[in-house]
A protein has these predicted regions:
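Phosphate/dinucleotide-binding and metal-coordinating scaffold of catalytic cores
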Residues: 1-360
Length: 360
């Protein structure tokens, strides 16, 4: 990612910071688990349609005090500090980098707000030698588990689409977008929602992987054409198919994203706002605008707040495919963000269901 692109991203996303945190601060004040009216509005009975809720959201944003809408006087100082924090930096001993980052996660903060090692970690993730490679078969999408120098494990997700390609259809259409993982990482850092894995773009050499790095199982899910000029990968996952293999370029390079493998254990839960993934069948939350009333006795106050925050984050990246979510030390983390940024021409408002059903 060039410096110009990063500055542009920071400039655009900074404008969203005030809106997101104003919404969160304002609406959370209405969320009280001791009340039976979660889902009711202070202005009367909750509207029974998604469009009605969206109208209420816009109305409340317009009613915010100017202090929540003005740019922070410290904006430029903070922006420059964020930029410097994520600029790749040189290092001497990669083992030291792995050791330091291993102890970063705390609750659902997967990395510190500011740390001089971050730039070194990003540099190491994109440049350290790949020692071995194998399939990472869990989940629905193709990904690889790579071992880098110093025994560091990382996940690699490949590039399926050009950056400007529009994915039509439902919000969950298409394969994972590798750049969505990268953008989610930087957006989380800007919003101080440091719940996503550290991510950076990288190219891998499929010929080198096939001939030198892959284990037997991975090699069995790779193909080489007759004259040995094209190396392809279809991997192993729920939706992986040999006829949908992805191939390297003329130099056998495949672009994608490297995701730092967060240490520790995670718990996985089905999202209360999971979709049915069927055109003719709605999920309970899509039919009942008071759906949150059924959750207030099942989920803790902090869990509901985390899921509301997640919905705002997912709306900003337009990820409507969070059918499950993970927790670390009982706090929600954002491990899979690959279905973001599919269609810039459509805003899928129902991603905000946890917000408008639980807080408005």
């Amino acid at each position: 990612m060039t410096k110009q692109k990063v500055w542009m991203i920071l400039g655009l996303l900074a404008a969203l910071i005030v809106l997101v945190f104003s919404l969160n601060f304002y609406f959370v004040s209405y969320l009280n688990v001791n009340q039976s009216g979660i889902g009711d509005t202070a202005y009367g009975k909750a509207t029974s349609t998604k469009s009605g809720y969206f109208h209420q959201l816009k109305k409340r944003v317009r009613a915010l005090k100017p202090i929540y809408l003005n740019r922070n006087p410290q904006y430029y100082r903070i922006r420059n500090k964020v930029w410097r924090n994520f600029e790749p930096q040189p290092y001497e001993n990669v083992t030291t980098i792995w050791d330091i980052s291993y102890w970063w996660p705390h609750d659902n903060d997967l990395y510190p707000a500011f740390d001089s090692t971050m730039g070194q970690l990003l540099n190491a993730l994109r440049s350290e030698d790949i020692i071995s490679a194998r399939n990472a078969p869990k989940g629905t999408q193709l990904k690889l588990l790579l071992h880098l120098t110093g025994k560091q494990k990382v996940i690699f997700k490949p590039k399926w689409y050009e950056r400007n390609e529009v994915i039509d259809g439902p919000v969950y259409s298409g394969k994972d977008r590798f750049n969505a993982e990268i953008m989610a990482f930087y957006l989380g850092a800007i919003l101080n929602m440091r719940w996503t894995p550290v991510a950076i773009g990288r190219k891998i050499n499929l010929k080198e992987i096939y001939e030198q790095k892959a284990d037997k199982l991975l090699r069995n899910t790779m193909t080489v054409n007759e004259d040995g000029t094209q190396y392809c990968l279809f991997g192993k996952c729920f939706f992986c198919k040999e006829e949908e293999a992805i191939c390297g370029d003329d130099e056998h390079m495949l672009e994608g994203v490297i995701l730092y493998l967060v240490p520790g254990s995670f718990e996985k839960y089905r999202s209360p706002w999971q979709r049915t993934y069927k055109d003719n069948q709605l999920a309970p939350w899509e039919e009942d605008m008071n759906y949150c009333n059924t959750l207030k006795d099942k989920l803790s106050y902090s869990r509901l707040l985390d899921l509301v925050d997640v919905s705002i984050f997912d709306f900003l990246i337009q990820n409507g495919d969070r059918h499950h979510y993970e927790t670390r030390e009982d706090r929600v983390v954002l491990i899979d963000n690959g279905k973001g940024f599919g269609n810039p021409n459509v805003d899928f408002i129902d991603i905000l269901a946890p917000l408008y059903q639980c807080c408005v």
